[in-house]
Amino acid sequence: MEPSESSTRELTLEEAVSFAILLQQNEQLAEAHEVFRRVLETAPDHPRALHYAGVLAHQQGRNSEALALIERSLALVPDQADWYSNLGIVLQADDRLDRAIDAYRRAIAIDPSHANAHSNLGVLLRATGKPVEAEAAYRAAIRLKPEHIDAYTNLGILLNGLKRTEEAAACYCKVITLRPKHREARKLLALAHCTLGEVDKAVDIFEEWLEEEPGDPIARHMLAACTGRDVPERASNGFVETTFDSFAASFESKLARLSYRAPALVAAMLEDSGLEHSHRLEVLDAGCGTGLCGALVAPFARRLVGVDLSQGMLAHAKEKNVYHALIKAELTDYLRDNSEGFDLIVSTDTLVYFGDLKGVIAALAGALRPNGLLVFTLEQAAGGSAGVDYRLELHGRYSHSQAYVERLLTFSGLQSKIVQAQLRTEAGAAVPGLVIRAAKSVSVQQAEV
């Protein structure tokens, strides 16, 4: 049987672009990239091919290329609301918030019913300190698309930060109605109940969650945070991996909305130490996350190593191009297994996932070379917490008393300087923290705790 003409003919350009988009939607990104490449070789100014090749470049982490391609497509066809919305997403990922806001506004001007553009605009208005406008944008998205889960979730987070906790809880309830097993909304609703003094309702949410998913690390950890019962000595590996893998892509933009200052505070503490930008030191970024500290400590480093438990976070750290090695490992295990040692160790917002710090601080001290320096941040327990070494807070991180930290550093043979500072905001309130610098002398003798 001879093949028919229709089964052997070449695709038209439009068919090829549509096929590439289908591959893209099915997450066959390499195959889609090849089809777009061949189309653009034939027709370099094909608007749809340019645009969706740009979207693909963004999906593959090539934001500069994505931006150039999408802007070329819009120069050719400037009346596409979806395309401006996609431009906003790329600009937002690149932390160009003002331009992203403009892109979302252009999308809305072209198509006022574009719910996603309204929702994403709300995120950026909140990030740039415009809560009233952000609320209006979220509500516009919900009015246009009543099942818009992201808009309801983000509106709830905004309202919670404005101390409108009951309204926030109503938003989370709506999300759960739309998607009953939405993990973030379940967690946020339970925490809202805790804030309102309705601990029993929070417990019910987490216990129902654990009945459905026994051993779920998020539910188990947050149940302990709400009740103060069965508090673990540190967050489990599962909790850390699940939490940070789930929002690695949006991690930096979320921290920007929280006025996150930990990396800058660590950099200031290093400057205060008199350490020179010599590129001579072996440096460890302990709990490197997406690499926010990497560029700040790179000038000190002959070799810079980043360690983190989240593969998603490490993937973003790699894009910073400042690390000589990135290693997926639990921090204490890595430190104990490492035999080379470091001249400088920095750690921001990592030890807040440890309650009992004795083991990890001993491991950090053991990994320091003589005259080595350790700089890290912790959240400070409220009111000094006399007699309390650490506490698991409602947000799921641990806070520590300064006296406890000083005692452990002395026990580990480290000479310390501790500065109190605001690390970030959370739910509209400042989060008090400790910025610690600890030095290891040539001769170290441990004392009794």
Residue ranges and their predicted role:
Residues 336-345:
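A short acidic, Gly/Pro-enriched loop at the edge of an enzyme's catalytic core
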Residues 358-370:
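A short glycine-rich, Lys/Arg-flanked "PGG" loop and its adjoining helix->strand segment in the class I
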Residues 376-397:
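Short, glycine-/aromatic-enriched active-site segment of Class I SAM-dependent methyltransferases
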